[in-house]
Amino acid sequence: MKKWILICSIGALFSCTNANNEVKINEPSHWKDNATIYELNVRQFSEKGDFNSILPHLSRLKSMGVKIIWLMPIHPIGELNRKGSLGSYYSVKDYKEINPEFGNKEDFKVLVDSIHELDMKIIIDWVANHTSFDNAWSTDHKDWYTLDSNDHLQPPLGTDWWDVADLNYENNELRNAMTDALLYWIDEFDIDGYRCDVASWVPDDYWKSAIDTLKQTKDVFMLAEAEGKNLHDAGFDMTYNWSYMHVSNEIAKGNQTLSSLDSLLMVEDSIYNSNDIRMYFTTNHDENSWNGTAYERYGASFHVQTLLAFTMPGMPLIYNGQESGLNKRLRFFEKDTIEWGEYSHQDYFTKLYKLRIENSAMWNGDTNTVFEKIDSKFENLFAFRRKNENNQVTVLLNFDKDSLVIENYKELGIGGYSMDYMEGKIIPKIINIPANNGKIYID
């Protein structure tokens, strides 16, 4: 995590930079430091639901500022104990094959190459914890699985995932086979990494060994669908910030206050370092399908919650369709195409992505970048500053149901020549923040 500092508004005056002066911005030390990520659900992305239908969208995604495209699982889906008519993407029948719904391996290679031509990265979802019940491993290598008292395959304990069989990582042959499958997509298709499903359910020592092996082949980007410093120590570049998601949902419901967010950030800072990237999001495939759209969960606070997620230290995620204001729960086991319309929110998300790309104070990996929480007299204002020697970004978020007027913004450490980032204007004499919205100022 970035350095976390609490400062008081009274007397907290900072020197400002003239708006006519160019801000010196260096290149990040690694491409991931100012990267952004976009989750793509191949089945629901287009009417055909295949790889070829993604190609016309790539230049649009590039223009939005997307750096990493994450494809949900691309493998054949098991038929035994299948849920719904199409099944769960996370019930993998063969780790080295392509789901025929999506196309073939040649189509996939064209997609990978096209993404690389636009200087973007592609990672694919990987389900290492379990397979479908009709995966060939279940008959050829039954000892690779967790068996019940009757010597039968079983789903992961404590779940209703009756369509998948739990794997047993005490078996070294399984470990070798899984790493071999991970290497396959890097060696044969030149993908750039993996998003690893329920990563905390797979032993850390396996991940450490596997990721070390993968990185001998390529500098892959590894995302864990879990949180914990142990996963970063095992080699993962980024982890889900589920804790933040839960706190933000509770704040939206009125069950928690902004002090809960303060507490969470303090805990985060005590656990993670500047190279441990945390992924922030307002929605993803799980939240959308099972818990409700971002509009359902956040209600009136949708915009302020979005601004918060996109300005936190870490990396922001967009789930496909958000740029069109997606407000329906996509069915998980059936075809349910996204209604794209006119991409009504695309400019909004493009600005938020570009904020992170172009401002070095928003980058990861720099130990000299500081996150300062700004104290103020406004109970429902969550204010903070991210800065380094070249760049300063101040974020003011109004979680109140009424607009907020700030007459003396210099008490918040904002300079008179600061730029209102979203509106592209010099800061006015009096700041007016609409209800459940925010302001971002660049020095």
Regions found by a protein language model. Give the residues of each.
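C-terminal motif of bacterial Sec signal peptides marking the signal peptidase cleavage site
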Residues: F14-S15
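Sec-dependent signal peptide recognition
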Residues: K2-I7
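Aromatic/acidic polysaccharide-binding cleft in carbohydrate-active enzymes
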Residues: M279-Y343
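Solvent-exposed beta-hairpin/edge-strand motifs
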Residues: K410-G424
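Carbohydrate-binding surface patches
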Residues: K373-K410
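Substrate-binding/active-site clefts of carbohydrate-active enzymes
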Residues: N20-I37, R43-I68, P73-F189, S209-Q216, ...
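Active-site-proximal helices and loops of the catalytic beta/alpha 8
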Residues: D187, D197-R278, L308, G325-L355, ...
